[in-house]
Amino acid sequence: MSISQAGLGLAGVVSRVLALALEAAGPVAGEDLREGPTLVVIGATGIVGLGGDLGSVAERVRADLPRSEVLIVSDAVTAAVGALDGHPGAMVAAGTGSVGLGTDMATSWRVVDGWGHLLGDLGGGAWIGRQAMRAVVEAVDGRRMDPVRLREALTAELGEVDSWAAQLYTSDERAGILARAARPVAQLALEGDDLSAAICREAGRELARTLCAAAFPGASRRVTWTGGVVSEGGVTAQALRAEVLRRLPGAEVTRAVGDPLDGAFCLAERIGPRALQSLQERRLGAWFPMPTAAPEPRGLDSVSL
């Protein structure tokens, strides 16, 4: 569920998801979580760059879990920790948007891109969709040859070309609309469509630039990627791998081990005080310890959202 779709704000979305999680846990486990010390880890899109009152999010959590400690981090952090299984290295995540993160999992966290579809997110789904849609409208204007297969695929997905501007400029979900166009582009690229393949290869190169910029000496040569845009065997992933190995000849390219949910669990289990401090200093997260009036915890259960 996206925050804008829910119309609730981050605190409202967290409250709803937490209620569903407690319901799924069942009455016994849910009561244990309410009564016992609990660490809640929340990974959310855009919380750092877009600001917002994260304290109100922690308050919402404590309305249901009064003896909880709350860690709110960028989803780039949970994605990287999950993909790298808690080990040092660098990752690029490419879904609707794109972001790279390199870390030693202690005091250093380097974020690259993640600027959103208007300023960045190069190589992500919205970027791919925009390149494809732009090629089609240029053909409509007579500025290039008509990419027949691409135009047919995009109109099947999004409707007639003359409706695209209204769809995009009247919606709060522009990035999602653009990213919908990326799906047929990826399929056509696999089928040998020249323009679609060229767009996907350029996306892979852009993602490689992001990943290599996120990697830094002293962390690890381990690199990986995650997200639907870079699914294994696709043209984008192939171009990404080739460009990474060209730019970082000694890189240790590995498959992503886990997803952002795995990253949240890993943070709940392993994160230490130095990492907490560095995340806050880099404005990648916010830590809300247990209220001082609460008894000292003897152990922590974890709930990851």
Pin down the residues of each PLM region.
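Phosphate-binding/catalytic loop of phosphoryl-transfer enzymes
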Residues: 44-147, 291-304
